[in-house]
Swiss-Prot record:
The lineage of its organism: Bacteria, Pseudomonadati, Campylobacterota, Epsilonproteobacteria, Campylobacterales. The gene is thiG. HAMAP family: ThiG. This is Thiazole synthase. Pfam families: ThiG. GO terms for biological process: thiamine diphosphate biosynthetic process. Its EC number is 2.8.1.10. It is an enzyme of class 2 (transferase).
Length: 258
């Protein structure tokens, strides 16, 4: 049992990780980032890279332990070309080739633009990046992103920052059935139980930001999510019992006599 869990690695392109919990950094005070990372036992942390905030980015990097893998995102990009420019900036800042593609042109619902994201995957892959596209769970778009060079697919569970949970559960399940890439649930997860449910489905990892950043005790909530992700993964590997009609767990005959 322990060996099975020990050998269970998250593989993204050429990278391997022991933790399947990815931590967002968008809403934390700088002082709390390090403690959240430690309690989450995360090995990957996302990082916004808008050109207007380069000074702030340098400060954030000072608070992230050196052994943590950075997953910069293209937050602020409204099209594929802007995503490429932000990705290039991230590489210039020394953040490596892993990049989370975020292309959002809708300021009301903040839904990712799948069409521009497909284009961004192709552009970034051609320049040697390892793209992880954030997307609205759609099979055709996911296939196109895979074919364009995506190393993993990051469908939203619910609108970003909403904490509504697995609203897109059925569509995420289709991606799990049909896409032979890591599926990382991103956006909308609001509680540890929801993260656990996602992992039980068989997703490769879960990314959480708002639900931890807005908790009363950020470090403790980060730990709660870490435990939930691990529990959900273990349940998936163990094999969940099928859902069915009522079945007696003990014999109902032969124990009462007239």
């Amino acid at each position: 049992m322990q060996e099975k869990l020990k050998n269970d690695k998250l593989k993204i392109g050429k990278y391997e990780f022991d933790s399947r919990f990815i931590l967002g950094s968008g809403k934390y005070s700088l002082e709390l980032i390090k403690s959240a990372i430690e309690e989450a036992k995360a090995q990957i942390i996302t990082l916004a890279l808008r050109r207007a905030n380069t000074g702030e980015i340098a400060n954030i990097l000072d608070y992230i332990p050196k052994n943590i893998t950075l997953l910069p995102n293209t937050s602020g990009a409204r099209n594929a070309e802007e995503a490429l420019r932000i990705a290039r900036l991230s590489r210039e800042l020394g953040c490596g080739e892993l990049i989370k593609i975020e292309v959002i042109s809708d300021s009301r619902y903040l839904l990712p633009d799948n069409y521009e994201t497909i284009k961004a995957c192709e552009l970034l892959a051609k320049e040697g990046f390892t793209p992880l596209p954030y997307m609205h769970a759609d099979l055709y778009a996911a296939r196109a992103m895979r074919d364009a060079g995506a190393a993993a697919i990051m469908p939203l569970a619910a609108p970003i920052g909403s904490n509504k949970g697995l609203c897109a559960k059925e569509f995420i399940q289709i991606l799990l059935n049909e896409i032979d890439l890591p599926i990382i649930v991103d956006a909308g997860i609001g509680s540890p139980s929801q993260a656990c449910e996602a992992m039980q489905m068989g997703v490769s990892a879960v990314m959480v930001n708002t639900a931890i950043a807005e908790a009363k005790d950020i470090a403790l909530m980060a730990r709660a999510f870490s435990l939930a992700v691990n529990a959900g993964r273990a349940a998936f590997l163990a094999g969940l019992a099928s859902v069915s009609e009522a079945k007696a767990s003990s014999p109902l005959t032969g124990f009462l006599r007239d």
